[in-house]
Structures are given as C-alpha cells and as structure tokens.
A protein has these predicted regions:
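Alpha-helical transmembrane segments of multi-pass membrane transporters/translocases
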Residues: 17, 199-211
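Aromatic-anchored segments of alpha-helical transmembrane domains
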Residues: 38-52, 104-117
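Alpha-helical transmembrane segments in multi-pass integral membrane proteins
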Residues: 24-28, 61-204, 220-226
Length: 227
C-alpha cells in the first residue's frame, strides 16, 4: 500500500479510525458501544480464526486487495472500539508491581512460537485473537493501575512520545540499510554491527527531531484552532 514507507499502511487505518471516532463513535452510548464491540469481535474471530485470508495470522491490511482491505478494517475497528470501551468503564485500583507484571506477561506472550493450523482452524490466529480480545486489554488495565515516579516516569513518557514518530520514520532508513547490505554481500551481524548501531541511532535522532520540530508544534496549533 505504501511501498516507500511500509508501516504507513497501519497509520492509514488509524487515520480512518480517528475519523470514525470524530464522526460517530464518540457519540455512541456505552451500551451501544459494547454491542458494537461484540459484533466486531465476532467478525474478528470469524475472519482470522477461520483463516479467510489464508495467512494463518492476523497480519493483514498492508495491501489494497479485497482480503487485506476488509481484514484491515476488521483488525482496526475491534481493538479500537475495545479500547474505547475499556476507557469508559475503567475503574482504577492500585496494583503493585504493575510494570513488572506487564513486562513479564509480554515476554511470555511474545515468546510463544507459531502454532500450526488444525482441521481448517487457524490455531495461531486463535491465539492472537485471545491475546487481542482478552489478555492485552487486561494488561492495559493492570498497567493503568500502576504508578511510576521520578526517572522511571520521565523515561516512560519519553519512550511513549518517541514511539509514534520512530515507527513511521525508521523504515526508509532500513531500506537504505538493506540496500547497502545487499550491495556489499553482508548477511551477518558481525559484518555490519557498527553500521547497524548507526542505523538505530539515526532513526531515534530523526524521530526525536520530527517529534519536537513537527509533531508537537502541529498538535499545539491544532489544539488552539479547536478552541
């Protein structure tokens, strides 16, 4: 969908989600939103667990063919509405060690290997669906019930602010890096680690500059215009 910057496809759907929120989703009552989320959850389970895309995973949306386009909308709208519902119904409680609970859980979840399909059922997609529908919302709740202060709070804030621009600017740099690797027949980390470190550092620096020189000023301007 976006050949010069691959991650742009997911932001494309996020923009659509934000438009839907501004036009009608924010006006939904909590009961209507809950019913809407339930329907989207059923569609999500049918599409991915039934392996409609034949990808055996939820990784769809990155092209504009029929399966990816509709799959991308389903992939967007279910977690999006789930997040809205969680925000509306959230009741904070104090959870000790929330950071370590969430960190440990994510390490375990991400360490689970690919699960082969069985009798036409995508078990890998089923696992991913359970994570999206149940486990990730629970982890968001636990994380929101935690607290941080001092350096930890500042570090978390900085990393959170940097994550969005880093996601969208790092891939063009990676393309250049890939081209350099292929041109020089380098296929191991031992042969390119200094350049790899430079790629990481330059990606972070570019993301930081985009955040401070573009993202934050534009958001401040838009906030003033909306008042």
């Amino acid at each position: 969908m976006f050949p010069l910057n691959g991650p742009g496809w997911s932001l494309f759907f996020e923009y659509i989600g934000n438009i839907c929120y501004a036009l009608f989703m924010r006006r939904m009552s909590t009961k209507v939103l809950a019913f809407f989320t339930l329907l989207l959850g059923i569609a999500h389970a049918w599409f991915f667990v039934g392996d409609i895309s034949q990808y055996d995973m939820i990784g769809v949306g990155w092209t504009i063919d029929t399966v990816n386009l509709w799959g991308g909308f389903i992939r967007l709208l279910f977690p999006f509405s789930m997040g809205m519902l969680l925000a509306r119904t959230f009741k904070p409680r104090k959870v000790k060690g929330a950071f370590w609970i969430c960190t440990t859980a994510l390490i375990v979840l991400f360490a689970v290997p690919y699960i082969p399909s069985d009798n036409g059922i995508s078990l890998n997609s089923l696992y991913e669906f359970v994570c999206i529908a149940c486990i990730f919302p629970a982890l968001v709740w636990v994380g929101a019930c935690g607290s941080a202060s001092g350096i930890t709070s500042k570090a978390n804030t900085f990393l959170g602010e940097l994550s969005y621009p880093l996601y969208i600017v790092h891939y063009p740099i990676m393309y250049i890096f890939y081209s350099w690797l292929i041109k020089n027949d380098i296929y191991t980390l031992s042969g390119c680690w200094p350049t790899a470190l430079l790629v990481v550092a330059s990606s972070i620096l570019l993301a930081f500059l985009c955040l401070k020189l573009y993202d934050e000023p534009v958001r401040r301007w838009l906030s003033k215009r909306s008042k």
